[in-house]
Each structure stands twice: as C-alpha cells, then as structure tokens.
Amino acid sequence: MGLETEKADVQLFMDDDSYSRHSSVDYADPDKFVDPGSDRDPHRLNSHLKVGFEDVIAEPVSTHSFDKVWICSHALFEMSKYVIYKFLTVFLAIPLAFAAGILFATLSCLHIWIIMPFVKTCLMVLPSVQTIWKSVTDVVIAPLCTSIGRSFSSVSLQLSHD
C-alpha cells in the first residue's frame, strides 16, 4: 500500500499512522452516526470477533499485488462485511433475540423453581444419608473386606520347576 505511481484523476495517500486498523466502516464525521455513550458490548463478550482485512488477507513482501487491486479488495472486503452483516441482522436479529429470550426465560424458570430447590433438598438430606452410609460401611462392608483380606493373606503360592 502507499502512493500510487500511475497518473490518475484521484490519488490515494495512505500512511500507517492515519490508516484505520479497525474493522468498522469509517465515516467522514463519525459523531453524526455513532452515539458515544451507547456501548453495545460493555462486557466485551465478542471482543474476539474483531476481524480486519489484515487478519484475513495478507501478502508477504515478496509477492505484492498492484496497489489499486489491494485498495479495491480492501474496500470490497470491508463494504461486503458491513453490508452482509446489516442484511443478516435485519432478518435474523429479531427472531433470534425472541428465541434466545424464550430459551433464557425457560432456563431461568427451571433453575429458580426446580433445580435450586432440588439441590437445597439434597444438601439438607445429605448429612442424614452420610450418617446412615457410614453406619452401613462400618457394620457390613468393613468386616466383609477385612475377612476377605485375611483369607487372601493366608494364601501362599509355591512354584516348582519340573
């Protein structure tokens, strides 16, 4: 990228400092289009989805395409990503938000009214079950394992070579 060497009606100068590295569309006056107070991802849940042109397409130093091709492909990449995302959100955002709302409402209701009462009941009953289980193991399982261990400890093997 850089200064186009061919003569043209319009020239594009791109310095590394002034070149935008983010993946959104640059407006001439961004304050008109973006409300600075509305952060739609305040918890940074989708910070991994910031994919720029350089993250997807990269030309090594040894193989560079023409500057116009590079600039046009960059512009087409950004515009197609922007337009397709807007198009998909128009048709998918409302139905998927509705489905996600139903799903989370159902899961919340199940968690609040079924799962947590069941867990709390189990935690209340567990000390009693623990006492009963300890008694059963002391009375039945421990003597059984002790007698089996003593029986096997008295077994001896002798090997002879004939």
From Swiss-Prot:
Transmembrane segments: none
Pfam families: Caveolin (PF01146)
Intramembrane spans: 87-107
UniProt modified residues of type Phosphoserine: 20, 23
Chief place where the protein resides: nucleus
Tissue expression as described in the entry: Expressed in aortic endothelial cells.
Keywords: Cell membrane, Cytoplasm, Golgi apparatus, Membrane, Nucleus, Phosphoprotein
GO biological process terms on file: basement membrane organization; caveola assembly; cell differentiation; endoplasmic reticulum organization; endothelial cell proliferation; insulin receptor signaling pathway; mitochondrion organization; negative regulation of endothelial cell proliferation
Gene Ontology CC entries for this record: acrosomal membrane; caveola; caveolar macromolecular signaling complex; cytoplasmic vesicle; focal adhesion; Golgi apparatus; Golgi membrane; nucleus
Record note on modification: Phosphorylated on serine and tyrosine residues. CAV1 promotes phosphorylation on Ser-23 which then targets the complex to the plasma membrane, lipid rafts and caveolae. Phosphorylation on both Tyr-19 and Tyr-27 is required for insulin-induced 'Ser-727' phosphorylation of STAT3 and its activation. Phosphorylation on Tyr-19 is required for insulin-induced phosphorylation of MAPK1 and DNA binding of STAT3. Tyrosine phosphorylation is induced by both EGF and insulin.
Intracellular or extracellular location(s): Nucleus; Cytoplasm; Golgi apparatus membrane; Cell membrane
Cytoplasmic side: 1-86, 108-162
PROSITE patterns reported for this sequence: CAVEOLIN
GO molecular function, one term: D1 dopamine receptor binding
Membrane topology: Peripheral membrane protein
Residue list for modification Phosphotyrosine: 19, 27
Quaternary context: Monomer or homodimer. Interacts with CAV1; the interaction forms a stable heterooligomeric complex that is required for targeting to lipid rafts and for caveolae formation. Tyrosine phosphorylated forms do not form heterooligomers with the Tyr-19-phosphorylated form existing as a monomer or dimer, and the Tyr-27-form as a monomer only. Interacts (tyrosine phosphorylated form) with the SH2 domain-containing proteins, RASA1, NCK1 and SRC. Interacts (tyrosine phosphorylated form) with INSR, the interaction (Tyr-27-phosphorylated form) is increased on insulin stimulation.
Assigned protein family: Belongs to the caveolin family.
Functional note: May act as a scaffolding protein within caveolar membranes. Interacts directly with G-protein alpha subunits and can functionally regulate their activity. Acts as an accessory protein in conjunction with CAV1 in targeting to lipid rafts and driving caveolae formation. Positive regulator of cellular mitogenesis of the MAPK signaling pathway. Required for the insulin-stimulated nuclear translocation and activation of MAPK1 and STAT3, and the subsequent regulation of cell cycle progression.
Name of the protein in its database record: Caveolin-2
Organism field: Bos taurus
